Amino acid sequence: MPVPGPGQVLVRIEMSGLCHTDIHAAHGDWPVKPSLPFIPGHEGIGRVDGLGAGVSAPAIGTRVALAWLGSACGSCRYCVTGRENLCLAQKNTGYAVNGAHAEYAVVDARFAVPVPESVTSLDAAPLTCAGVTTYAAIKAARVTPSERVAVFGIGGLGHLAIQYARLVGAEVIAVDVSEEKLK
């Protein structure tokens, strides 16, 4: 069993989604290769089971998400403006640090995101990647009520983009080559 270091928590994994990024990492077909050996999985949900030195939150027993962004420096121009995803020192879960396709994972406590008990682990897991990706797009586009939004490709991310756009009150146009996906 892994042991959490300073600033880390040990998470007992309840659910881990499979993303195409995990498949690319396993096949090694991206220009940036994962750190070997590695455990893939960046769509993990679990409960904090142990605390490393200096960690008081999240508390033991807290249900948390492990996302693609496993850690960032916290002090560069990107991090201090809330754009940690652009940090040049970021470490990605299941790629640069071991991921959630295991019974336990060690996670940077700053990036272990509490998950409400009202959301099942099955529902929460894909939100840590596809959900965050599509939410970020809707947010970056500054979609407002009554605006028209076209979503191209109604697959794993597209169906979430439709839901987020509707939640902000947009009129959504779904576009796909598959008639089945448009139903």
Which residue stretches match the model-derived regions?
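Glycine-rich beta-strand-centered segment in the early N-terminal region that forms part
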Residues: 2-16, 29-77, 116-118
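Acidic active-site catalytic centers that drive phospho-/nucleotidyl reactions
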Residues: 22, 43, 176
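Cytochrome P450 core scaffold surrounding the K-helix E-X-X-R motif
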Residues: 21-27
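Short Fe-S-cluster ligation motifs
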Residues: 45-51, 101-123
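Mid-domain Rossmann-like dinucleotide-binding core that forms the NAD(H)/NADP(H) cofactor-binding site
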Residues: 64, 117-183
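Residue-level marker of beta-strand positions
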Residues: 43, 62-63, 78, 104, ...
